[in-house]
Amino acid sequence: MFNLYSLIMHDFTLLSTGAVLCTVGLLVLLFFFREKILRYKCLRFWESNAEDHQNIEAFLKNYGSYAPKRYNYSEVKRMTSCFKNKLGQGGYGSVYKGTLQNGSHVAVKVLNGLKGNGEEFINEVASISRTSHVNVVSLEGFCFEGCKRALIYKFMPNGSLEKFIYEERSDSVRQLGWPILYKVALGIARGLEYLHRGCTTRILHFDIKPHNILLDEDFCPKISDFGLAKLCMKKESIVSMLGARGTIGYIAPEIVCRNLGGVSHKSDVYSYGMMVLEMVGGRKNVDVGVDRTSEIYFPHWLYQRIELDEELQLIGIMNEEEKECARKMVMVSLWCIQTDPSNRPSMSKVVEMLEGKLDSLQMPPKPYLYSPSRSEVDSLEVGSYQCSRSNV
């Protein structure tokens, strides 16, 4: 009996020791592989960072004195008083108010250092450095120091357009009156016309939306955020693109479903039209919080009113001049959101239509106004860009 007990205890001790050794071995292996993975990620990060630095240096060399000023990170901290006054935040990072040594105010967009490989950052610096227009934001400088990246813009006292068109208001008063709304819409159109035709290299923005339109003290609009922009030669009409880019609600159909036509400057025209429709309505074109999309898709409702020559019933219209202004903005927008890119006007034509008389505008063809369901919007928001017959 005693020998049996001793034998059992001996076997138990061996099993316990084996289990402990096995556990220790697994922990050692896990630690080894963890170190390998961390070392690999670290190596990839520094390789990417080194490549970014090479691209930035090449960019500075190519542009010489035309390149924006480069600041080091300590200067960025000093101009923002150690990031004291935060203006906003998004997926890209945060924006802070700052002051340059000459006393002028700036908005400093500090990017998430470990996000991506720096392509969007370099893209934005390269794009805006090619521009000089009253309706395009001016880049005062940038910072690229290790994983610390920042873009420094001229400060816009009135912030972005979105806060003036979506915030709560009364049933009869708008935050921005119709003369200012028209001025903003025309200014954005002129800025896009410049990007498409006025630059040595054509710039396609691909993310036109109220959030990316900044307003100065006189409500003069400035197109901003060129992180998704694409540069191409002026003679090029169709550009190649891997994957969809833009924001749901403003993305042109051909970007999601390539069988509808090639991606070109007409994609910006579509985004512009959708944005102006939200400006005149003071609301989102699609309310993703409601499932009955037939009842909530604003462009459908507007087209029916125009087609039947009925009052648009838009908020804040005080006289016949404002009524004509509103109707003109709606007509132009409905031309811009045509499903077929070839049916959309160029931005030069948009400017011409906005500056012309209402009675000179032809009724636009009825576009295939597609309003996505809530589930489809949710799937698009997480990056699942799919094309089917139901949404073309």
Placement of each model-derived feature along the sequence:
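Conserved eukaryotic protein kinase-like
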Residues: 7, 11-392
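Extracellular/luminal ectodomains of secreted and membrane glycoproteins with large N-terminal domains
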Residues: 1-6
